[in-house]
Swiss-Prot record:
It comes from Streptococcus pneumoniae (strain 70585). Its EC number is 2.7.7.6. Residues 1174-1192 have a biased composition (Basic and acidic residues). This is DNA-directed RNA polymerase subunit beta. One of its GO terms (cellular component) is DNA-directed RNA polymerase complex. Residues 1174-1198 are annotated as: Disordered. PANTHER family: DNA-DIRECTED RNA POLYMERASE I SUBUNIT 2. The RNAP catalytic core consists of 2 alpha, 1 beta, 1 beta' and 1 omega subunit. When a sigma factor is associated with the core the holoenzyme is formed, which can initiate transcription. It catalyses: RNA(n) + a ribonucleoside 5'-triphosphate = RNA(n+1) + diphosphate. It holds the Pfam family RNA_pol_Rpb2_2.
Length: 1198
């Protein structure tokens, strides 16, 4: 027997064909969300407050300090928040200290700081009753970047940019004349020496002393001449910079100094963030820049005078490691003192080394390092600016290297915690201005923190972020895999990111640093391709937001691959050689071959085993979760694998799902971490279990109660239903499944079913990827799903009186009211179809001035005789089903409703959808198709043992698409079904060809895995042997019921008076320019005329046509369409005297748009008006009679 058994949870064993020993379990798959939010609550929020506070008033007599904060218990539970359309949030209280510096008085007070949304255990937020996800954003990291560009003459020039987290950019560039310029905040360029002089190094000699003598420096110094002898060089430089930044304003050295300090050296205006400081220190540090360079002067220990490195030594990694402590210390440190007129007058500490130029052995080049400022320094320093200029000048000498912006060492992830912190910071900085003003205006004696703090800017910023940010998304809840993928999504779009239109091919492309960090397969097709990515299965964020991936360390001395795990970011990995996970190992852990496949800086090739530093932990670390669920992924073309990964996320949860016979072993972990199942929080024993709740008694005697969700509506309108897995007496451990979620079976992801599939054509019905299906799949509810739709109706106060929910609806027969209760609300369990009343509601109508008799009637009979119109909630077009639940919210019951709303009724309708012709189905290999025919079981081809086939697919769909994985799955699936086992074939480490055929043989199948099929209609065998097996097929969310649409009478656009478009608006089908040509070509003038008039925007024509059709009269001639009138007005507005004449040369009056339109009515629907008018006339006649009778009766009674 090939393979070995692996236990997944307590309910499933699979035969696994993997050969690689996994040394590291998958991390929790939603930790990117939960860890980030936890870090935000633990210290991120505190850091934001400490960034903005303390705040002083303008005279510096008062100061407001931050002390601490406390988050209390949430107001609602999760379930209550969902039901009441509320947010799951907790009140936050912040303690402030107000210090009066004149009197020394201190007031400490706790201030309510609004409700803050709290993340659920599943990594989601509940905002206004809807479950949302904050998608992590992929952005360019702050730091310093160098690039090269070739001009039209083929000359290479360089550029560099310092990009902060927030603040002004500082750029350097060289031109064709080898002069180096700098730009501050994208303004006009100035020679870079001007900025050096402004930093306090004004003399030409000083500049040559710092940077050394190079052509770029010399040319720039010559260009930067002293124009105004009245000013010192520093003052002149400052004024020149001020003129660039504030053109047209009077320039003084002092104003320029304060402007530059504000732009670059004020922590409130300029922030590199921890990550920016880390990246700058890493790039400008001398250790990385000296690597593999030849030193030109001996390196001497400043304390002892000992020569550490002789001149002419090549600085290999080992040499640098031997003097690392000296490099981090005072070795070659030089302190420069700027002159008194400088922007920053503190001494500038640099590290200066001289090396031999790589391009010319006779030249010496100066390398300046920024001497590693402390990590706490969040602004750029003069030392950073000088070191950046030095790196820039070194590039022209062949030292250093330019950066690749798409390298994942230069792109980082902003997860939910950081995105929230930025929003709070934004709100606090708006609040700061407000606080400062109130401190200055009000009387110091009576001020308290509560009085000067207005929390509205902060709560508004947070609310806006959750409600309308591009990164706050309605959770994709089709199935647990789509939830999980959504939580792990990385988007390059959003505020501060890229835009679709401006993103080129390079940004979207797969980069070698994606390996183990971002999935190269799973990304949307269409305009977002490559901009929206997914975290790889082992991917993990470090404290700076860079994605790390785990590797097994190789002991270089012994050659043993250890079980020690090291997490590396992309730029750390560039320094090493990494072997692939499927490299063969001996028993003692050494490599079995002398040469192994590995990679170093993106070069994939064979490397000697003795130079390998690390080895991958698992073959599936390359791909994301959804991709890792595709068996035989290694046999599929990547384009089709992309579709397969994406389509699994669109699978509809079925009534009784089956886990795949051929899985990858990923199904268990994906289901476990998705948040859709119920997982035991503690060890214990089950004491009670039914469909609604499970009770587990812990060992310490306390009781855990787990509530099971039954048929809740998911965000996607599918049924979110959980099924209990345990029974009384079961012992459960922490992390065990207590209940399956939707699309799960026995603790594994189960998106579809395992039908018997044959690759054969049948009567041409599977042309173009269509799917032929057996009626058994319909009858046995194999592909049946439940869909829940929510409808709501609310009663409001109107000018004419309140609306009311009632059973007494005008002009509605008793038959339509049969399922309504005495309030007028549908009963639970009622079967409804389109047009049925769900909630009876009437709205008062406007009345004319009443006559004396009518007033008398009102006085006698109350409001019964008032005119009302029917505004009931009805089942919309194309919907039907069974009423699953009704929820009623009223102010009387203490429910929070919007202002003006008195009552809200929600009706949930469940719809059972069997699979039908027109539904879309797919396998896991991108093999998708639409059901074209459902054939009776008896007509389907059958196997020699009489088993009919369930599905027939077109064999022509395989070769050109190159997704051969489906054929492998087919054969292995049949073997698994015959043997009664489940199989795991992990990606890149699955069943080999030998495993496949030995399993086929074990199952007793024919050696070619094909079989003879017999025609169900005739009983004759088909000519050729056919590949028949079991393939995992899923039903996708694109169902024909949601797409079918027809319009008879419907709404029109207010402006153009043409029918609206789309199913949601109950719109018509667009008859475009080309379709008009087609009718013109056939000379179908009458058809064309009615399409362009009655059916479109001839307002009077369509009214008359409607009337004529209802009364059975001939349809009158059409009039002038509205769009023609618009054209005439357009030409008239251009000054052309254009009029329309009839055959007698009389001018035709075109009605004005305002005529016949009620100003209050935004949505004009003339046909509805005509209907209503007819109904009103009939009703008025009927009511006049009734009123007469009533008067007579009243008179009689008197």
């Amino acid at each position: 027997m090939a393979g070995h058994d692996v236990q997944y949870g307590k309910h499933r064993t699979r035969r696994s064909f993997s050969r690689i020993k996994e040394v590291l379990d998958l991390p929790n798959l939603i930790e990117i969300q939960t860890d980030s939010f936890k870090a935000f609550l633990d210290h991120g929020l505190k850091e934001v407050f400490e960034d903005v506070l303390p705040i002083s008033n303008f005279t510096d007599t008062m100061e407001l300090e931050f002390v601490g904060y406390e988050i209390k218990e949430p107001k609602y539970t999760l379930e209550e928040a969902r039901i009441h359309d509320a947010s799951y949030s907790a009140p936050i209280f912040v303690t402030f200290r107000l210090i009066n510096k004149e009197t020394g008085e201190i007031k400490t007070q706790e201030v309510f700081f609004g409700d803050f949304p709290i993340m659920t255990e599943m990594g989601t937020f509940i905002i206004n009753g809807g479950e949302r996800i904050i998608v992590s954003q992929l952005v360019r990291s702050p730091g310093v970047y160098f690039n090269d560009k070739v001009d039209k003459n083929g000359k290479v020039g360089y550029g560099s940019t310092v990009i902060p987290n927030r603040g002004a950019w500082l750029e350097l560039e060289s031109d064709s004349k080898d002069i180096t310029y700098t730009r501050i905040d994208r303004t006009r360029k100035i020679p870079f020496t001007t900025l050096v002089r402004a930093l306090g190094f004004s003399g030409d000699d000083e500049i040559f002393d710092i940077f050394g003598d190079s052509e770029l420096v010399r040319n720039t110094v010559e260009k930067d001449i002293h124009k105004n002898p009245m000013d010192s060089r520093t003052d002149e430089a400052l004024k020149e910079i001020y003129e660039r930044l504030r053109p047209g304003e009077p320039k003084t050295a002092e104003s320029s100094r304060s402007l530059l300090v504000a732009r670059f050296f004020d922590p409130r205006r300029y922030d590199l963030a921890a990550v920016g400081r880390y990246k700058i220190n890493k790039k400008l540090n001398v250790k990385t820049r000296l690597l593999n360079q030849t030193i030109a002067e001996p390196l001497v220990d400043p304390e002892t005078g000992e020569i550490l490195v002789e001149a002419g030594t090549i600085m290999t990694r080992s040499v640098i490691e031997s003097i690392e402590s000296h490099l981090d210390g005072d070795l070659n440190k030089i302190v420069y003192i700027p002159n008194d007129a400088a922007v920053v007058t503190e001494p500038v500490v640099l590290q200066k080394f001289k090396v031999v130029a790589p391009t010319d052995p006779d030249r010496v080049v100066t390398i300046i390092g920024n001497a590693n400022p402390d990590d706490k320094v969040r602004t750029v320093t003069p030392a950073d600016i000088l070191a950046e200029m030095s790196y820039f000048l070194n590039l022209a000498e062949g030292l250093g290297r330019v950066d690749d912006i798409d390298h994942l060492g230069n792109r980082r992830i902003r997860a939910v915690g950081e995105l929230l912190a930025n929003q709070v910071r934004l709100g606090l900085s708006r609040m700061e201005r407000n606080v400062r003003e109130r401190m200055s205006v009000q009387d110091n004696e009576v001020l308290t923190p509560q009085q000067i703090i207005n929390i509205r800017p902060v709560t508004a910023a947070v609310k806006e972020f959750f409600g309308s940010s591009q990164l706050s998304q309605f959770m994709d809840q089709h199935n647990p895999l789509s939830e999980l993928s959504h939580k792990r999504r990385l988007s390059a779009l959003g505020p501060g990111g890229l835009t679709r239109d401006r993103a080129g091919y390079e940004v979207r492309d797969v980069h070698y640093t994606h390996y183990g960090r971002m999935c190269p397969i799973e990304t949307p097709e269409g305009p977002n391709i490559g901009l929206i990515n997914n975290l790889s299965s082992y991917g993990h964020l470090n404290k700076y937001g860079f994605v790390q991936t785990p590797y097994r360390k190789v002991d270089r001395e012994t050659g043993v691959v250890t079980n020690e795990i090291v997490w590396l970011t992309a730029d750390e990995e560039d320094e090493y050689t990494v072997a692939q996970a499927n490299s063969r190992l001996n028993e003692d852990g050494t490599f079995a071959e002398k040469i192994v496949m590995g990679r170093h800086q993106g070069v994939n090739q064979e490397y000697p085993a003795n130079i390998v530093d690390y080895m991958d932990v698992s073959p599936k670390q390359v791909v994301a979760v959804a991709t890792a669920c595709i068996p035989f992924l290694e046999n599929d073309d990547s384009n089709r694998a992309l579709m397969g990964a994406n389509m699994q996320r669109q699978a509809v949860p079925l009534i009784n799902p089956q886990a795949p016979y051929v899985g990858t072993g990923m199904e268990y972990q994906a289901a476990h971490d998705s948040g859709a199942a119920v997982i035991a929080q503690y060890d214990g024993k089950v004491t009670y279990a039914d469909a609604d709740k499970v009770e587990v008694r812990r060992e310490d005697g306390s009781l855990d109660v787990y509530h099971i969700q039954k048929f809740r509506r998911s965000n996607s309108g599918t049924a979110y239903n959980q099924r209990t897995l345990v029974k009384v007496g079961d012992v459960v451990e922490k992390g065990d499944f207590i209940a399956d979620g939707p699309s799960m079976e026995n603790g594994e992801m189960a998106l579809g079913q395992n039908p018997i599939v044959a690759y054969m054509t049948w009567e041409g019905y599977n042309f173009e990827d269509a799917v032929i299906m057996s009626e058994r799949l319909v009858k046995d509810d194999v592909y049946t799903s439940v869909h829940l739709e929510e409808y709501e109706s609310e009663t409001r106060d109107t000018k004419l009186g309140p609306e009311e929910i009632t059973r007494e609806i005008p002009n509605v027969g008793e038959d339509a009211l049969k399922d309504l209760d005495e309030m007028g609300i549908i009963r639970i369990g009622a079967e409804v179809k389109e047009g049925d009343i769900l909630v009876g509601k009437v709205t008062p109508k406007g009345e004319k001035d009443l006559s004396a008799e009518e007033r008398l009637l009102h006085a006698i009979f109350g409001d019964k005789s008032r005119e009302v119109r029917d505004t009931s909630l009805r089942v919309p077009h194309g919907a039907d089903g069974v009423v699953r639940d009704v929820k009623i919210f009223t102010r009387v019951n203490g429910d929070e409703l919007q202002s003006g709303v008195n009552m809200l009724v929600r009706v949930y309708i469940a719809q059972k959808r069997k699979i039908k012709v027109g539904d879309k189905m797919a396998g896991r290999h991108g093999n998708k198709g639409v059901v074209s025919r459902i054939v009776p079981v008896e007509d389907m081809p059958y196997l020699p043992d009489g088993t009919p086939v369930d599905i027939m697919l077109n064999p022509l769909g395989v070769p050109s698409r190159m997704n051969i994985g489906q054929v492998m799955e087919l054969h292995l699936g049949m073997a698994a079904r015959t043997l009664g086992i489940h199989i795991a074939t992990p990606v890149f480490d699955g069943a080999s060809s030998e495993d496949l055929w030995s399993t086929v043989k074990e199952a007793g199948m024919d050696s070619d895995a094909k079989t003879i099929l017999y025609d169900g209609r005739t009983g004759e065998p088909f000519d050729n042997r056919v590949s028949v097996g079991v393939m995992y097929m899923i039903k996708l969310h694109h169902m024909v019921d949601d797409k079918l649409h027809a319009r008879s009478v419907g709404p029109y656009s207010t402006v153009t008076q043409q029918p609206l478009g789309g199913k949601a608006q109950f719109g018509g089908q667009r008859f475009g320019e080309m379709e008009v040509w087609a009718l013109e070509a056939y000379g179908a003038s009458n058809v064309l005329q009615e399409i362009l008039t009655y059916k479109s925007d001839d307002i009077n024509g369509r009214l008359k046509a409607y009337e004529a059709i209802t009364k059975g009269k001939p349809i009158p001639k059409p009039g002038v369409p509205e769009s023609f009138r618009v054209l005439v007005k357009e030409l008239q507005s251009l000054g052309l005297d254009m009029r329309v004449l009839d055959e007698d040369d009389q001018e035709v009056e075109l009605r004005d748009l305002d005529e016949g339109m009620d100003e209050d009515v935004i949505h004009v629907d003339d046909l509805e008006k005509a209907r209503e008018k007819a109904a009103q006339e009939a009703k008025a006649a009927f009511e006049a009679e009734e009123a007469e009778k009533a008067t007579e009766e009243a008179a009689e009674q008197e």
